[in-house]
């Protein structure tokens, strides 16, 4: 019988030399933040500071109207639909920009556009939103209690799917050698990769094609979602995932910011970019 230790040189348990590190260590990686296109616009979002609130009014200072966008400007854009073929699944729609109500801290309400990120953030700082704060839910147990606020008013309760697993639980408990009962609570999670979410969108009017560079782990999901939200054929959308500076799962979904960037590129005919900053990521 062959000595198991011999497999460590070229088989299971072997130390495999990494081939991709050299160019990263030399600063030769190509991330979305490295993309520079002529005439590119930058986006900054005004986000909700509250977990649950009605939007009463949005005040824009004079002179920035053409650089500020709210949900009413996106009437041709569909929200991101959460749906499933599972029996009993309750579907929901996430608006690209919050309409009438916000449902979580950090939800984008207003998008501001300028020639650079600093100017876009200056415009965002000048926007004032009047909120009517509503009771919020902070954990799953409270969310299921009767009488607490509904996340989606059309639902009868805050549960999007119920499933049943049949087993003889009482028999298993009665035959167990020991039973441990504990209640555990975990804090909210934050992936904190080196690179945040990021997108560059460019519209080619001659080809009627949208090209999106996204820091995504699932470019095909992004392409399908953009097609549904923007009303474009998938064949007219090209999603490019360049080097991605970490993801850990949170870059595996379609983002409202990606949809807005695609729409804005189509509207203006200019390339647009949004780079998530650390504060946006943490909220």
Q: Can you annotate each of these PLM segments?
A:
Residues 20, 195, 257-258, 280:
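Acidic-residue sensor for enzyme active/binding pockets
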Residues 75-79, 245, 281-282:
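Short gly/pro/ser/thr-enriched loop/turn and capping motifs at secondary-structure boundaries
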Residues 81-84, 174-189, 273-282:
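Short Pro/Gly-enriched beta-strand edge/turn motifs at strand-loop
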């Amino acid at each position: 019988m062959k000595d198991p230790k011999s497999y460590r040189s070229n088989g299971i348990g072997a130390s495999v030399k990494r081939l991709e590190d050299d160019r990263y260590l030399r600063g030769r990686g190509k991330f979305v933040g490295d993309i520079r296109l002529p005439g590119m616009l930058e986006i900054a979002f005004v986000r909700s500071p509250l977990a649950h609130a009605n939007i009463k009014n949005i005040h824009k200072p004079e002179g920035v109207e053409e650089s500020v966008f709210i949900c009413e400007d996106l009437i041709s854009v569909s929200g991101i639909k959460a749906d499933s073929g599972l029996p009993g699944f309750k579907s929901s729609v996430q608006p690209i920009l919050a309409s009438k109500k916000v449902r979580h801290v950090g939800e984008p309400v207003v998008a501001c556009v300028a020639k650079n990120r600093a100017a876009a953030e200056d415009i965002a700082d000048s926007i004032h939103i009047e909120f009517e704060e509503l009771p919020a839910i902070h954990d799953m147990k409270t969310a299921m209690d009767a009488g607490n606020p509904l996340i989606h008013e059309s639902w009868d309760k805050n549960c999007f799917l119920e499933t049943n697993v049949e087993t003889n639980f009482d028999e298993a408990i009665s035959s167990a050698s020991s039973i441990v009962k504990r209640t555990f609570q975990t804090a909210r999670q934050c992936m904190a990769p080196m690179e945040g979410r990021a997108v560059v969108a460019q519209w080619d009017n001659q080809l009627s094609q949208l090209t999106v560079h996204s820091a995504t782990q699932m470019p095909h999901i992004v392409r399908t979602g953009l097609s549904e939200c923007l009303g474009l054929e998938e064949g007219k959308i090209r999603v490019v995932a360049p080097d991605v500076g970490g993801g850990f799962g949170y870059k595996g979904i379609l983002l409202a910011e990606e949809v807005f960037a695609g729409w804005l590129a189509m509207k203006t005919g200019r390339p647009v970019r949004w780079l998530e900053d650390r504060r946006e990521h943490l909220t």
